[in-house]
Amino acid sequence: MKKIILLFSTLFLMLSPAISNAAGFALGVTVSDNTLDTAGKEDVDSNGSIDAKKNVSDDFNVGSIFAEFTNMGDRFGITVGLEIIPFDADIDKRSITQSELGDENDTASTGTNSVEGTVKDHMTFYIQPGYMVGSNTMLYGTLGFASATVNGKSKSITHTNINKDVDLDGTKVGVGIKHVYDSGLFIKADYAETSYDTISFTTSNSTKATADLDNTSLALSLGKQF
């Protein structure tokens, strides 16, 4: 994925001197409606067998800021940009009651397991090749690399508690439409899917928890060309 983005970035730089009517630098803000799907698994003794599974979805809205640079040819253009979410996004806390069977020396116990998380420092580097369908309107595709930090917290009667930060990387693909006004103001609307790498947490008593996250978003952006 990183090699693909590097290839597009190199192409972008090679085209820069050759295109005389480059659209230029832009700043903007984005509001997006998101659905984050999380598939969680738990391996109590890290032996490769899955002891528990849970799939959940969280719907949320989030704001972000972006900076980008666009080069335009006659009909084709390419944009390179960076989007930053300056806020933390919480994954809703989930709880479930669990009973632990006792042995000949211990009595059975019942308790509540819970898991929650926070996504922070989220940023996306993206490439958007596009095609003009009018004098001021472009259809474009998005290819991006996303990175963030996830703080995972878990409490369980079968393992020691978790409170740990892990790195989260993902690949973003999408499509959108952009309209630029004569004043330099522009609006963008796009749909995107981000598939994140699987992350894992291991407790001190060898319980391994893994989570696979996928995000779907509908976004509306407002920006200004300079």
Regions inferred by a protein language model and the residue ranges of each:
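Gram-negative outer-membrane beta-barrel domains
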Residues: 20-226
